Amino acid sequence: MSAGKYLLVAMLMILLLVQPAGACPELMPLEPVTEEQYPAFAALLQSLAVYESFLSERDQIDDLLFPVNGHSVGQAQSYLQQGFTCSFSNNLLLYLTRWNNDYGRLQLIPGEGFPILAAADFNDLYYRILDDGAVVFQRDYRECYRSGDCYHFQVTVGEYSNGWLIQSLTLVECPDTY
């Protein structure tokens, strides 16, 4: 590889790895939620209800679980896009399902999900508004896996023509634990 190609690859790596704080919501300051954020939070709860129903409304055949609202990839995408962006619903499907050739439909993959926020969590939330108008809600969970631990659960919602949709979910360990 020539020196020019090495330089190009190095520059691309720097651009991909070094991002501004706006691209890293965890670096931006948070504020306690106010009633002004409640409409976006209420929509977030509706989106999480879509996720919950996708997982809980299922057929069981032997020890296999099949989503009722997602026999095919297209049907599952359409269902999940009631509460999630197109790209994130695709990521959810990759994480939650696999195609079962024997039954000709999507199968749920057993595993751990993510925390589900409820209306009672509203007063425990913090938020920030991103440059594009999306809202990041954060709830901290403590003492989950071991004494003294702390995790940030962040849900980013954006407003689209069909309402507020979940764009991303992250669960990361707080950097200042131990």
Q: Positions of the model-derived regions?
A:
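Bacterial N-terminal signal peptides
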Residues: 9-17
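Sec-dependent signal peptide cleavage junction
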Residues: 18-28
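Core segments of small alpha/beta cavity-forming domains
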Residues: 32-110
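Surface-exposed, charged secondary-structure patches
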Residues: 100-145
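Short beta-strand edge/turn micro-motifs at domain boundaries
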Residues: 148-178
